[in-house]
């Protein structure tokens, strides 16, 4: 029985039964695939370690298919009181999904482009609804799929090495994994700025932005993890108390934030427009070095992706997470059929010439009809939870 067949069974069973089916299937192949993710039961909790350090712990479909059923099992286990997720290697929590594999699979007419997004979004929703305290240690690079594994959880711990970004508009995609839900809910217009520019937040700014709930010095993560796992039948309040104590004692990266101290007024003003064209005009009229730099960055992005992203966030601001994930699944499938994603992957990841030829090449040529096609229902193929 291959994995695609196993997953097709899942639409007809409950979430608990879904977990059981996957676990049974994985036992037949775990010896060849388990190295990508480590699943350990320690002390009072379960620990998930993303274990592809050479690839900055990039998220694969195989990893999703191991994490999801174990998460559901631990959630329903009366002896498991919390879940910790972290990345191996010290450089990254998770730098995103395997984008190159997606492009190659689509060209080969394989089902990966449906399976990965569908199963990843189901996992994102499971993290958001998890009934046990979920602690993501977002130490190092955290982008794309790594954001989906962390930001929807109850607790997110940043360090001085954290680097957060949603750079998808630069490869012909959009900030998915629930970006349409959490980005417009950040302070002011910060989420719109991050989504359209791919701007990188670092260190304490990841906490200041609200992406992380706590900040802890990276050298303290190991003892923090051990202290959490040594708790006796902890509640969410107990977990929060430990995290707060480490947060209060953190000393690293205490310099004032340039982005929050100096530029938030500009971000709120320039990114409050309802069209990408007006946002660019606002930046031009502002004329400050910061505004001009952001205008230049936006002008390099896929025009189609920019318009998709702005609409995604505007619509997502009033939707539930599940509604957003359904919307985003529709957009991903349209992007896989389009030009810009494959061109972005070519320019950034394959040929690495960094000069993608977007089609259309200008914002004015992305019509409302074009844009609407990315948001239309997929009927029976829509994402289901």
Curated annotation (Swiss-Prot):
Residues 1-32 form a transit peptide. The modification N6-acetyllysine is found at residues 54, 91, 100, 220, 296, 352, 359, 364. SUPFAM superfamilies: ClpP/crotonase. Pfam families: ECH_2. It catalyses: 3-hydroxy-2-methylpropanoyl-CoA + H2O = 3-hydroxy-2-methylpropanoate + CoA + H(+). Its main location: mitochondrion. The modification N6-succinyllysine is found at residues 54, 91, 100, 220, 249, 256, 296, 300, 352, 376. One of its GO terms (molecular function) is 3-hydroxyisobutyryl-CoA hydrolase activity. InterPro entries: ClpP/crotonase-like_dom_sf, ECH_dom, HIBYL-CoA-H. The modification Phosphoserine is found at residue 233. Its EC number is 3.1.2.4. GO terms for cellular component: mitochondrion. GO terms for biological process: valine catabolic process. Pathway: Amino-acid degradation; L-valine degradation. It is found in: Mitochondrion. Belongs to the enoyl-CoA hydratase/isomerase family. PANTHER family: 3-HYDROXYISOBUTYRYL-COA HYDROLASE, MITOCHONDRIAL (PTHR43176:SF3), 3-HYDROXYISOBUTYRYL-COA HYDROLASE-RELATED (PTHR43176). Hydrolyzes 3-hydroxyisobutyryl-CoA (HIBYL-CoA), a saline catabolite. Has high activity toward isobutyryl-CoA. Could be an isobutyryl-CoA dehydrogenase that functions in valine catabolism. Also hydrolyzes 3-hydroxypropanoyl-CoA. This is 3-hydroxyisobutyryl-CoA hydrolase, mitochondrial. It comes from Mus musculus (Mouse).
């Amino acid at each position: 029985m291959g994995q695609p067949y196993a997953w097709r069974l899942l639409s007809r069973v409950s979430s608990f039964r879904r977990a059981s089916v996957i676990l049974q299937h994985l036992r037949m192949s775990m010896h060849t695939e388990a190295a990508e993710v480590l699943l350990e039961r320690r002390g009072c909790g379960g620990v998930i370690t993303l274990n592809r350090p050479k690839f900055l712990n990039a998220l694969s479909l195989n990893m999703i298919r191991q994490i999801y059923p174990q998460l559901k099992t631990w959630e329903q286990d009366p002896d498991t009181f919390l879940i910790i997720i972290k990345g191996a290697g010290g450089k990254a929590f998770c730098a995103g999904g395997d984008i190159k594999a997606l492009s190659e699979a689509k060209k080969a007419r394989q089902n990966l482009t449906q399976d990965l997004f569908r199963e990843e979004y189901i996992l994102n929703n499971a993290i958001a609804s998890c009934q046990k305290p979920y602690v993501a240690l977002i130490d190092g690079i955290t982008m794309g799929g790594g954001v989906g594994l962390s930001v929807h959880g109850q607790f997110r711990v940043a360090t001085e090495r954290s680097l957060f970004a949603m750079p998808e508009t630069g490869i012909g995609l959009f900030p998915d994994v629930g970006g349409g839900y959490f980005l417009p809910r950040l302070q002011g217009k910060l989420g719109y700025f991050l989504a359209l520019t791919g701007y990188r937040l670092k260190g304490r700014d990841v906490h200041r932005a609200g992406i992380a709930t706590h900040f802890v010095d990276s050298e303290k993560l190991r003892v923090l993890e051990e202290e959490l796992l040594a708790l006796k039948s902890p509640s969410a309040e107990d977990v929060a108390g430990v995290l707060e104590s480490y947060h209060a004692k953190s000393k690293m990266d205490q310099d004032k934030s340039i982005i929050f101290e100096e530029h938030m007024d500009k971000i709120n003003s320039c990114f409050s427009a309802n069209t990408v064209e007006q946002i660019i005009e606002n930046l031009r009229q502002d004329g400050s070095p910061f505004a001009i730099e952001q205008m230049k960055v936006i002008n390099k992005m896929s025009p189609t992706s920019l318009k998709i992203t702005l609409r995604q966030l505007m619509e997502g601001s009033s939707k539930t997470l599940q509604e957003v994930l359904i919307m985003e699944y529709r957009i991903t499938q349209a992007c896989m059929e389009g030009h810009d994603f494959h061109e972005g992957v070519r320019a950034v990841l394959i040929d690495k010439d960094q000069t993608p030829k977007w089609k259309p090449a200008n914002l004015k040529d992305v019509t409302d009809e074009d844009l609407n096609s990315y948001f239309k229902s997929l009927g029976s193929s829509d994402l289901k939870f």
